Amino acid sequence: MADFDINILGCGSALPTTRHLATSQIVDLRDKLYMIDCGEGTQVQMRRMRIKFSRLNHIFISHLHGDHCFGLPGLISTLGMLGRNGELVIHGPKEIESYMRPVLDIFCKGLPYEIRFNLIDPTTHSLVMEDRSLSVYSIPLKHRIPCCGYLFAEKAKEAHIIREMTDFYQVPVRMMQEIKRGADFVTPEGEVIPNARLTRPAVAPKRYAYCSDTAFHPSIIPIIEGVDLLYHEATFAECDAARAKETFHSTARQAAEIAYKAQVKRLVIGHYSARYEDMAPLKKEADKIFPGTILGEEGMRLSV
């Protein structure tokens, strides 16, 4: 079982190539799957990576450019053919429902499951969804059309019971949940046993930030500060910085600057322009600012 993994299905940009697939990722938190963006080829890559379709319940769309959403109709149709009956929630800017409803009416009539659209304001940093395992927040980005990234914040886990100590102090089973949540134990004689003697701290919760597509945008730094893993688009090399500015994209160096200033633990870059056959120069540029930058690739699994 994956504890908290990121699966990169595609890390190319708008123009299709034989080197990269259009953008899509799967966040796997203890076998709960959350998709970010859904470009062409997404479901084929899910097959290649042996990702279970049935465990996908939420899809987060950053913006309405085709390389981030053209894979949705096919995936939705496939889920129906696989006999899905549970609700699928699609989160994204209001335009996502306007795009998908006519497509669903034509190609996906009679689906055996419900699709619900959770429409968000991509210009604000706000809570998008939460369940027992994590909270997901929007990250306002700077692109040619309304666009947001997503911050996946794992919820704090309960402390681990030290069985030898709870047995020694004869802590009743009915009190174990309270102890896990931080309560002290009072013995029948009135002695207070501090929680720290009865439990071990759980592993600190992790956070993952996805930022694509965007121009260089320092305003996101307070939102992503200190995250365990940051995916930031790096469409262009520094020699094409003028083109990056014109198209509201980032260079690899700019992605690294954001990571450095936000003091993130690790950086992975992607969304490469089709003009580059070799991505090594992008990594080299990023490494100068943020050493150890990871060059995103299709099929890559990263532990947060």
Swiss-Prot record:
Entry note: cofactor: Binds 2 Zn(2+) ions.
Reactions mediated catalytically: Endonucleolytic cleavage of RNA, removing extra 3' nucleotides from tRNA precursor, generating 3' termini of tRNAs. A 3'-hydroxy group is left at the tRNA terminus and a 5'-phosphoryl group is left at the trailer molecule
EC class: hydrolase
Family (UniProt): Belongs to the RNase Z family.
EC number(s) given by UniProt: 3.1.26.11
NCBIfam families per record: PRK00055.1-3 (NF000801), RNase_Z (TIGR02651)
GO MF annotations, alphabetized: 3'-tRNA processing endoribonuclease activity; zinc ion binding
Keywords from the named record: Endonuclease, Hydrolase, Metal-binding, Nuclease, tRNA processing, Zinc
Free-text function comment from the UniProt entry: Zinc phosphodiesterase, which displays some tRNA 3'-processing endonuclease activity. Probably involved in tRNA maturation, by removing a 3'-trailer from precursor tRNA.
Active site annotation, chain numbering: D67 (proton acceptor)
Binding residues for Zn(2+) 1: H63, H65, H143, D213
Chain positions recorded as Zn(2+) 2 binding sites: D67, H68, D213, H271
Cofactor: Zn(2+)
InterPro entries in UniProt: Metallo-B-lactamas, RibonucZ/Hydroxyglut_hydro, RNase_Z/BN
Subunit structure: Homodimer.
CDD domains: RNaseZ_ZiPD-like_MBL-fold (cd07717)
Protein name as catalogued: Ribonuclease Z
